[in-house]
From Swiss-Prot:
This is L-aspartate dehydrogenase 1. NAD(+) binds at residues 121, 181. Keywords: NAD, NADP, Oxidoreductase, Pyridine nucleotide biosynthesis. It catalyses: L-aspartate + NADP(+) + H2O = oxaloacetate + NH4(+) + NADPH + H(+); L-aspartate + NAD(+) + H2O = oxaloacetate + NH4(+) + NADH + H(+). It holds the Pfam family NAD_binding_3. Belongs to the L-aspartate dehydrogenase family.
Length: 258
């Protein structure tokens, strides 16, 4: 295709710029039509920035990728979808809010838009979604991260080593809004936010974010594991997350939320 894919972005931080870099290297031409930020004058990087969603949508993006956190997704997702523009959310954990998820699905259906859930930092999301049709009884996500990947983004004390959290995916995204968005993707692909179990561990010796997905049911069972290097010291996201956002923006490798 010679016609550039027009992509908008919510946010202009490390993750957004990494994702834009991947898009720039694709065989199909891609035009970043703009980033939605609070203060365009303070935005990092060379991407064009806009201070309002109206200005961003005026650039006629075909798809918008959210890279700015759960609050930004809650604020802007509905107007983007209502404009008939597909949405790729990085902050999938926000969709644990049943009312928000319902409103976004309603807006998408009315406008003919899609919510494209990226695979994020994990492999095996497609397999989990397929297994759901056969029957899934249990799903466990276990994340092991160095202290810096967690302590900077949560309030309250955390242990120096070992288990920092055990609970449901719904509880995890509330406790770790910057670190547990992957659990939202797993919950949506599988058995939901309340039945998906999550363990978050701290390992001072870890040099990467380790993600494990274990599932069991009538289909059988599987165990997937990814050791993901982080984008930078200033970002909790694994490098593969930026790649998954780029892939979903290009139209493949995503879970269509319904």
């Amino acid at each position: 295709m010679n016609t550039p894919l027009r992509v908008g972005i919510v946010g202009c931080g490390v993750l957004a710029n990494a994702m834009a870099g991947h898009l720039a290297r694709q065989p199909r031409p891609v035009e970043i039509v703009g980033c939605l930020v609070r203060d365009p004058g303070r935005a990092r990087g060379a991407l064009p920035c806009h201070g309002s969603w109206e200005a961003l949508l005026a650039q006629r993006p075909e798809v918008v990728v959210e890279c700015a956190g759960q609050a930004a997704l809650a604020q802007y997702a509905q107007v983007i979808l209502a404009a008939g523009v597909d949405l790729v959310p990085a902050s999938v954990g926000a969709l644990a809010d049943d009312a928000l998820r319902g409103a976004l699905l309603e807006a998408a259906a009315a406008a003919g838009a899609r919510i494209r859930i990226p695979s994020g930092a994990m492999v095996g999301i497609d397999g989990l979604a397929a297994a759901r049709h056969v029957g899934v009884a249990e799903v466990l996500y276990r994340g092991t991260m160095p202290p810096v990947a967690l302590q900077r983004y949560v309030s309250g004390p955390l242990p120096e080593r070992g288990l920092a959290f055990a609970g449901s995916a719904r509880e995890a995204v509330a406790r770790f809004p910057k670190n547990a968005n992957l659990t939202g993707t797993i919950a949506l692909a599988g058995i939901g936010f309340d039945r998906t179990r999550v363990e978050m561990l701290i390992d001072p010796d870890a040099t990467a974010n380790v993600h494990e997905l274990l599932a069991r049911g009538e289909f059988g069972d599987f165990h997937a594991r990814v050791s993901g290097l982080r984008i930078s010291e200033s970002s909790p996201s694994s490098r593969i997350v930026a790649g998954s956002l780029a892939q979903a923006a290009l139209g493949s490798g995503f879970l269509a939320l319904s």
